[in-house]
Swiss-Prot record:
Keywords: Cell inner membrane, Cell membrane, Hydrolase, Membrane, Metal-binding, Methyltransferase, Multifunctional enzyme, Protease, S-adenosyl-L-methionine, Transferase, Transmembrane, Transmembrane helix, Zinc. Signal peptide: none annotated. It is a multi-pass membrane protein. This is Prepilin leader peptidase/N-methyltransferase. Belongs to the peptidase A24 family. Plays an essential role in type IV pili and type II pseudopili formation by proteolytically removing the leader sequence from substrate proteins and subsequently monomethylating the alpha-amino group of the newly exposed N-terminal phenylalanine. Its cofactor is Zn(2+). The keyword Transmembrane helix applies. Its EC number is 3.4.23.43, 2.1.1.-.
Length: 286
């Protein structure tokens, strides 16, 4: 009860935002390292197929590389990032977006992820005051942020993020946090099969692939958290966001944008404002 009351005060919201800044810093590690880890695993697997299970690909560095080790370094000069240089937001601004070792530019994405994580977490904290609901909702939000940026940069929606998010949604439903267990499981199934069907229909007609399997899994995750009845709203919202991007930024850049980020954004908006969006589209009665 005391925690619930604290979460409704400005001080509680402030602490959520402050903690989320640190989470945003970790999400930057996830966004950078998970694709590298996947690439190394694929190279090692391909090498073992041709050279035996006990062989080691010489292109892969021998040093351990995961989300915890080694310590963060500048990708340009290898300068080790000191603790004082790793303070969320402040360090990037103090260093003026440059490495203290070589002066190379540090991507503004690091600053954006930290600020975005804090901002979205504060919004979530305004919606959910119950500690259990808030905890689940924050993890949902943080995972979508990581997936959004990874897919935008690498056209990847890693199983090591989508599958835990799917099971976490089902776990939340087991305790009736957002929806019940039956709705969660059915939602996951329908969410996956809907895009899977579109994928194969498009491929049969055109002979080309219109999206990746990661999109199926991401939509399954979103529906596991919200139920199958939110599927039309999520897809329609994602399509609108994609069209806005294509007509605006996409045409100028001449670069295709994966569907995952639009699904993630639409899924998060629907998670918090699904009823309002549904009324706007006439899906739910006002």
């Amino acid at each position: 009860m005391l925690i619930s009351e604290l979460l409704q005060t400005p001080l509680g919201i402030f602490f959520v935002g402050l903690f989320s800044l640190m989470v945003g810093s970790f999400l930057n590690v996830v966004i950078y390292r998970v694709p590298v880890m996947m690439d190394r695993e694929e190279k090692q697997y391909a090498w073992q197929v041709f050279h035996g299970e006990d062989s080691v690909c010489p292109e892969i560095p021998k040093q351990r590389f995961n989300l915890l080790v080694p310590a963060s370094r500048c990708p340009h000069c290898g300068h080790r990032i000191r603790a004082i240089e790793n303070i969320p937001v402040i360090s990037w601004l103090f260093l003026k977006g440059k490495c203290s070792g070589c002066g190379a530019a540090i991507s503004a994405r690091y600053l954006l992820v930290e600020l975005l994580t804090a901002a979205l977490s504060v919004i979530v904290a305004f919606h959910y005051h119950d500690p259990l609901s808030l905890g689940f909702a924050l993890v949902f939000t943080w995972t979508l942020i990581a997936l959004c940026f990874i897919d935008a940069e690498h056209q990847l929606l890693p199983d090591r993020l989508t599958l835990p998010l799917l099971w976490l949604g089902i776990l939340a439903a087991l305790f009736n946090v957002f929806i019940n267990l039956e709705s969660s499981v059915i939602g996951a199934m329908i969410g996956y099969l809907s895009l899977w069907s579109v994928y194969w229909l498009f491929k049969l007609i055109t002979g080309r692939e219109g999206m990746g399997y990661g999109d199926f899994k991401l939509l399954a995750c979103l529906c596991a958290w919200q139920g199958a009845w939110m599927l039309p709203i999520i897809l329609f919202s994602a399509a609108i966001l994609g069209m806005i991007y294509a007509l605006g930024i996409g045409l100028r850049m001449g670069k295709p944008m994966p569907f995952g980020p639009f699904l993630a954004i639409a899924g998060w908006l629907t998670f918090l404002y699904g009823a309002q969006i549904g009324q706007l589209f006439g899906y739910f009665p006002a």
